[in-house]
Amino acid sequence: LMLDADRAVWAHIGDSRLYHFQDGKLVFQTKDHSVSQIAVMLGEIPLSQIRFHKDRSLLFRALGQSGETPAPQIDEQTLENGLHAFLLCTDGFWEYVLEEEMEQDLQAAHSAKQWLSSMRQRLQARAPRGNDNNSAIVIWEKIEKRED
């Protein structure tokens, strides 16, 4: 993730995700490079079922694959005035914290640390013991562009 005065640019690969929130609302999330994401895109399953799909861990693009290094997907968004929050997390995190809960916790938080702590509490209450695949980092950025 790279932020400058009026845009965010990121690269992503596999099933770790980047979520972008503006003023407490989810405005973008990366699409996984997984068999279950293809099933969502083809209309075979709803997005709400991706967490439970039998093929959710089958990736067609990931770091560490044998052979040629796959190219990451690169995206960017223009940043409007407001508070922008970014959550970068592994599948072991987003599988246990719903997007609606991410929004709720963000809207109630007074800091990035508090937001991450609230989501981590949800994860710890739901994840099986020994789940160690749950890395996450959050970034808050307030954008205030001068009007011409």
List where the protein language model places each region.
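Conserved catalytic micro-motifs used in adenylation/nucleotidyl-transfer and phosphoryl/amide-
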Residues: 1-22, 28
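Short, acidic Gly/Pro/Ser/Thr-rich loop/turn segments
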Residues: 8, 17-18, 36, 95, ...
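ATP/adenylate-binding site constellation spanning eukaryotic-like Ser/Thr protein kinases
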Residues: 13-15, 23, 56, 90, ...
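A short, polar/proline- and glycine-enriched secondary-structure boundary/capping micro-motif
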Residues: 20-25, 38-41, 99
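Conserved, helical-rich catalytic subdomain that frames metal- and/or nucleotide-binding sites
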Residues: 31-84
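C-terminal catalytic subdomain
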Residues: 61-89, 93-148
